């Protein structure tokens, strides 16, 4: 897959990014280089390789799954402009 100048300008327009002609030409080369690298990565044989979440072997810390209300409701609504008990009051926006 390769990117042409029209594609770069179209993507920039969709992203609402102002790109000059010189920048678009430079980005065309950069994006084609990136896509070439991604194509190289997709050709690597990874059969038998376990997926990793980190480059360092580690085990995630686990904690007990305990249901609790956190006892923070009053603190959470303390700075709200309007509240009733432990609920936020907001103006009606849909008729």
Curated annotation (Swiss-Prot):
**Protein name as catalogued:** Aspartyl/glutamyl-tRNA(Asn/Gln) amidotransferase subunit C
Q: Which GO terms describe its molecular function?
A: asparaginyl-tRNA synthase (glutamine-hydrolyzing) activity; ATP binding; glutaminyl-tRNA synthase (glutamine-hydrolyzing) activity
User: Which keywords has UniProt assigned to this entry?
Assistant: ATP-binding, Ligase, Nucleotide-binding, Protein biosynthesis
Keyword Cell cycle on entry: no
What is the organism field in this record?
A: Sinorhizobium fredii (strain NBRC 101917 / NGR234)
User: What gene, per UniProt, encodes this protein?
Assistant: gatC
* Record has Metal-binding as a keyword: no
Q: Which family does it belong to?
A: Belongs to the GatC family.
The processes (GO biological process) annotated in the record are: glutaminyl-tRNAGln biosynthesis via transamidation; regulation of translational fidelity; translation
Which EC class heads this enzyme's classification?
ligase
Q: Which reaction does it catalyse?
A: L-glutamyl-tRNA(Gln) + L-glutamine + ATP + H2O = L-glutaminyl-tRNA(Gln) + L-glutamate + ADP + phosphate + H(+); L-aspartyl-tRNA(Asn) + L-glutamine + ATP + H2O = L-asparaginyl-tRNA(Asn) + L-glutamate + ADP + phosphate + 2 H(+)
Q: Tell me, what does this protein do in biology? A: Allows the formation of correctly charged Asn-tRNA(Asn) or Gln-tRNA(Gln) through the transamidation of misacylated Asp-tRNA(Asn) or Glu-tRNA(Gln) in organisms which lack either or both of asparaginyl-tRNA or glutaminyl-tRNA synthetases. The reaction takes place in the presence of glutamine and ATP through an activated phospho-Asp-tRNA(Asn) or phospho-Glu-tRNA(Gln).
State the taxonomy lineage: Bacteria, Pseudomonadati, Pseudomonadota, Alphaproteobacteria, Hyphomicrobiales
InterPro entries per the UniProt record, alphabetical: Asp/Glu-ADT_sf_sub_c, GatC
What EC number(s) does its UniProt record assign? 6.3.5.-
Its subunit composition reads: Heterotrimer of A, B and C subunits.
